[in-house]
Curated annotation (Swiss-Prot):
Predominant cellular place of this UniProt entry's protein: nucleus
Annotated source species: Fusarium vanettenii (Neocosmospora pisi)
Any one GO cellular component localisation term in the record: nucleus
Residue spans of biased composition, Low complexity class: 12-30
Coiled-coil zones: none
SUPFAM superfamilies from the UniProt entry: Zn2/Cys6 DNA-binding domain
Keyword DNA-binding: yes
Name of the protein in question: Cutinase transcription factor 1 alpha
Biased composition (Basic and acidic residues): 110-119, 669-683
Length: 909
């Protein structure tokens, strides 16, 4: 128990929620959480009542045996602790000696799930009568002296557990039949990694070098040993937290339905078929910890008025379920490791204060990953003895952890936790979402839209991780920044968009919630990538030498995010979005504030409309996510405040200036190398074979393929890279050709006048990628407008096809293009630009085919650098890059505001 949750003494007032006769107002849906009797300070039941000794048993009771949990009826008598806690009749089955199978009482042949084993569903279960046996309350397992000195002796239960644990390794190594036995409880798996010395002994004896998952011995129950010793203090704390309470049946049903409709597709970590079967079975209910966590996540998408406060927010209800789930977790109430991982992931749906570094979404997702890796979820289970349905569930859980790891790292500016070099879990397939079992067909077949959404979301999250490592990691600041990292990331994103299945491909005329959510994450990744390369704004004294249109791409991506949000608002679906949509809107708002500096009045008007749309959406989202209220208040202070707007706009260019200086240095070094005397064999045409050194690539792309249980399939999906005849080992010469580019490299274009690219695409190895490598056509003819759908009609992009050589370039055509006051291009340069498609423009683009010009900023005053701060902003402070709202308030010099007292009734405009 955490010290903050456990009161030092029991409170004298009665515990209303603990009394069975008062539980009718919150009747639970299943029997998973009947309220245990309130701990009493007296051993007698009532005045004049008689206390009876427990009847001792020689074996586990029926309930504990059916659920495969530890039963203490043999040591403490009937009723056991579990039956007392859940007010279930504690019955010891009669011994059946040498009887045929099928007559042995309640034991069932079941396929274990993360949510414990499933019992056979009884369509008409008999009502459970309360136990007639009295019980003596459990005394605390640890006694505290008056002076606070801890005890120095073990209790009987602790000594018994220590004796059992001492033989765990012996059971693993010396029982061959045990290590090869089927794993019937997926939540009780021992993982042995390769570096463990114990692995040598197990593999040497069993000869199973590819197996890393083993069933835990039956006598090892993990934290369950502590659960059976919950004393009065711990039970009292759980009662005070309401951990055993559930909403009325109808409301519980509604919350669970909302969870599986709006949350489960994003975090598909529960086998819905088994969960619902247990939910309807009072004799074999689901884990109480998991159920409270599901209810927590369900509040984020439930519209029931019973859950809302006066402002229409479900935050108080979410906090209630969060505290209940957290109390159960802190008490070690659950010992099924997979159930714990599932619950920890869902506890991250309580996300209110991103500036809090403990018990927020970052904390819970990291703890879930640690528990999962402790059970070996990061390793392939294809060779394990898990059932097929459990193997599928484990894969879904692992890749869900991966998506949470990347998205939380992006939103909060934290380092990633999962290194795919340490994992060999195969990429998900459509079959992994099937929940059919060997003897029954699932009543919840997978939704194709949900399946494709998550598959594409996993792929997008890997690219998101590449952007983080290459553009925002600490290591990226210390190494030379290669322009090819930017183009490679863009090509990976363009390839993702081109291969996105039509069923989840979002366009304005074809709105769907899951496609909209998927593509909002895609455009947020684009903003993240190109924000690191955005110039501070053109001026006569500081022209931008880079021809890559990062600013254009970032602005267009922000416009697409706004368009998606407008469609979600029109369909009344904003409240169902996860918390990451706050970060997406945050990114779009920053881009819109930055674009307000355009001297073109029409662009300013369109940008103001977008700001209004984003602020309106943020206001609506803040009813569900408190962090949205913080961002809303922040931009209410920024918009219209010229000093704060200028501070944000100027700070954007600091990072770009560093990158630009690095590129300039690289170009100068390359130019000097080209002017140096050629070596004797430099002009010889050398044919590099496939075994010769390949051009240097970023670490995450060049690493070898992770081990896979099905190597043949992987190799068929990932063709070996083709070596370029003109390739050189030098990283600089791989993409910097200058005027003396080597033969058979792509000629320079207006898009990349200083860079020439190898004629064959690099091996962009992505673990989640199950399509062929980048096509030759995409590599040779890539244009930034391929980052957007045809219907987006990305304006004012140069024709980037390789139509001329670097030597014949007209450098005057690559300079800043002034606006003509109408958002169009001058006639003499119109031929150098093309527009893709004739589709529908995003909302806010109609009538503006060229929404910005390279020179957005008016000339700055003499002596004012575009990378410098305004006179009122101070020097040296870096612009925040995450959702830590407290950092943003400090950055703008705004006095801290209590988010619980923010006024959301400010008119927009």
């Amino acid at each position: 128990m955490s010290s903050g949750d456990a009161p030092p003494q029991a409170q004298p007032q009665p515990h209303q929620q603990e009394q069975p006769n008062q539980r009718q107002s919150s009747t639970p849906a299943p029997s998973a959480a009947p309220v245990p009797p309130a701990p009493s300070t007296s051993t007698s039941n009532s005045a004049g009542g008689v206390s009876f000794r427990r009847q001792r048993a020689s074996r586990a009771c029926e309930t504990c045996h059916a659920r495969k949990v530890r039963c203490d009826a043999a040591s403490l008598g009937v009723p056991c602790t579990n039956c007392v806690a859940f007010q279930i009749e504690c019955r010891i089955p009669n011994p059946k000696r040498k009887k045929t199978q099928g007559t042995g009482g309640s034991q069932t042949n079941k396929d274990s799930d993360s949510d414990r084993g499933d019992g056979t569903e009884d369509p008409s279960p008999r009502p459970v009568a309360p136990t007639a046996a009295s019980f003596a309350p459990r005394t605390p397992s640890v006694f505290h002296s008056h002076n606070g000195t801890p005890p120095t002796t073990l209790t009987e239960a602790q000594a018994r557990k220590e004796e059992v644990d001492s033989g765990t390794y012996l059971d693993l190594v010396m029982k061959p039949k045990f290590t090869r036995a089927p794993i019937t409880e997926a939540g009780r798996v021992a993982y042995l990694g390769e570096s463990s010395n114990l692995t040598l002994l197990v593999h040497d004896r069993q000869g199973s070098a590819d197996v890393v998952h083993y069933p835990l011995p039956e006598n090892v129950r993990g934290s369950r040993a502590r659960l059976t010793e919950l004393d009065n203090v711990e039970i009292d704390i759980l009662h005070q937290r309401g951990a055993f309470l559930l909403p009325p049946r109808a409301l519980c049903d509604e919350l669970i339905d909302a969870y599986f409709s709006w949350v489960h597709p994003i975090v598909p970590v529960i086998n819905r078929t088994r969960f619902m079967r247990q939910y309807r079975d009072p004799k074999n209910p689901p884990s109480l910890l998991l159920l409270q966590s599901v209810l927590l996540a369900g509040t984020r998408a439930c519209n029931n008025a019973q859950l809302m406060d006066a402002n229409g927010s479900t935050t108080p209800a979410a906090l209630t379920f969060y505290k209940r789930a957290k109390a159960l977790y802190d008490a070690n109430y659950e010992d099924d490791r997979v159930t714990i991982v599932q619950s920890l992931l869902l506890m991250g749906w309580y996300w209110e204060g991103p500036e809090d570094v403990t018990k927020n979404v970052f904390y819970w997702s990291r703890v879930a990953t640690i528990v999962a890796q402790g059970s070996g979820m990061h390793r392939s289970v294809e060779q394990s003895q898990l059932s097929r349905s459990d193997k599928r569930l484990w894969k879904r859980i692992w890749w869900t952890l991966f998506t949470r790891d990347r998205s939380v790292a992006v939103a909060l500016g934290r380092p990633v936790h999962i290194n795919l070099d340490d994992a060999d879990v195969e990429m998900l397939t459509e079959d992994d979402f099937i929940e059919d079992e060997q003897d029954r067909v699932s009543e919840y077949p997978p939704d194709p839209i949900h399946v494709q959404f998550f598959l594409e979301y996993v792929k997008l999250c890997e690219i998101m991780g590449l952007v983080l490592s290459q553009q925002y990691s600490v290591a990226s600041k210390g190494r030379q920044r290669n322009a090819i990292d930017l183009t490679h990331s863009d090509m990976a994103l363009a390839d993702w968009l081109q291969n996105c299945p039509k069923i989840v491909y979002w366009e304005v005329p074809r709105h769907h919630f899951w496609s909209a959510l998927l593509h909002s994450n895609y455009y947020t990744t684009l903003c993240l990538l190109h924000r690191a390369h955005m110039p501070p704004g053109g001026s006569a004294r500081f022209p931008d030498p880079s021809p890559y249109p990062s600013r254009n791409i970032a602005f267009q991506a922000a416009a697409m995010i706004t368009s998606i949000v407008e469609n979600l608002a029109a369909h009344d679906q904003l409240r169902y979005c996860p918390a990451f949509v706050v970060y997406s809107l945050f990114s779009a708002l920053i881009r819109h504030v930055y674009q307000m500096r355009s001297p073109v009045p029409s662009i300013q008007q369109v940008t103001q409309d977008r700001l209004r749309s984003c602020m309106s959406a943020m206001k609506e989202i803040s009813r569900v996510w408190l962090v949205g209220k913080m961002v809303y208040a922040l931009f209410e202070s920024i918009i219209g405040n010229k000093v704060l707007e200028e501070r944000l706009q100027k700070a954007e260019g600091k990072r770009h200036r560093k990158m630009r200086q690095t590129l300039t240095t690289q170009l100068e070094q390359h130019s000097r190398q080209q002017e140096a005397p050629k070596r004797k064999y430099d002009e010889m045409a050398i044919d590099f074979g496939t075994n010769t050194p390949q051009p240097q690539e970023s670490y995450e792309r060049s690493r070898p393929q992770t081990p896979s249980a099905v190597k043949a399939e992987t190799s068929s999906m990932q063709p070996p890279p083709v070596s370029s005849p003109g390739a050189r080992q030098s990283a600089a010469d791989t993409f910097m050709g200058g005027t003396n580019s080597r033969p058979q490299t792509r000629p320079a274009t207006p898009f990349n006048p200083s860079f020439s690219v190898p004629p064959t695409p690099p091996d962009l190895y992505l673990v989640t990628r199950n399509s062929p490598n980048l096509s030759q056509s995409l590599w040779e003819n890539f244009q930034p407008d391929q980052l957007f759908p045809d219907s987006a009609a990305m304006p004012a992009f140069p024709n980037l096809s390789p139509i001329q050589t670097h030597a014949s370039l007209d450098h005057s055509a690559m300079g800043p293009v002034p606006g003509n006051g109408q958002g169009g291009m001058p006639n003499q340069q119109a031929g150098q630009f093309q527009q893709r498609g004739n589709g529908i423009l995003p909302q806010g683009f109609q009538g503006h085919t060229n929404m910005w010009q390279p020179n957005l900023d008016p000339n700055l005053p003499e002596g004012q650098s575009p990378d410098s701060w305004s006179s009122t902003s101070g020097q040296g402070q870096a612009v925040p890059t995450t959702l830590n709202v407290e950092d943003w308030f400090q950055f703008f010099g705004i006095n801290g505001t209590d988010p619980n007292h923010l006024n959301l009734d400010i008119p927009l405009g």
